[in-house]
């Protein structure tokens, strides 16, 4: 509710299948919303406000140039993503922020539906639609970001480290 007061154009979509399928199920629910839009993972804190720009001229995915990573990354040629993989050398570590122009957004709408409904499709990450399964339909540019621009929060303790207002909460038990 706090976000809606500050940003009344935000639309929240509840995915009751999030425990049963991979994140492609969430993308499938909003597949018609990708045109001229940013997509952001919910576990990111943006420290550089210039990450979100008023104008984008081509579809892109944020990545940080690294020598080695065991995280999701992509290779590129002439600034275009050529391959997504888990772990790599001399590549771009993938950050969960991307932008899609109108043409790519239209293609994403149909490609997500196609992949979602194929055998094994519900186990895919949505990014695999554009960066792997249907990659020949797209020219996704690498948009480079740097250390300190974005922080990923994977645990409650990591959240408490950057936001002391959560210190009053005790450790969550399973």
Where are these regions (language model features)?
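A conserved acidic beta->alpha catalytic loop
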Residues: 1
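Conserved alpha/beta core of the MobA/IspD/sugar-nucleotide pyrophosphorylase nucleotidyltransferase superfamily
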Residues: 94-174
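Conserved beta-strand segments of alpha/beta enzyme cores
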Residues: 9-11, 80, 139-141
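Conserved beta-loop-beta/alpha segment of the NTase-like Rossmann-fold superfamily
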Residues: 4-71
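Short, motif-level signal for alpha-helix interfacial/capping segments enriched in acidic residues
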Residues: 18-21, 79-80, 133-135
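Short, conserved catalytic or adaptor-binding loops enriched in Gly and charged residues
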Residues: 4-6, 75-76, 132-134
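Conserved core of the sugar-phosphate nucleotidyltransferase
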Residues: 47-120
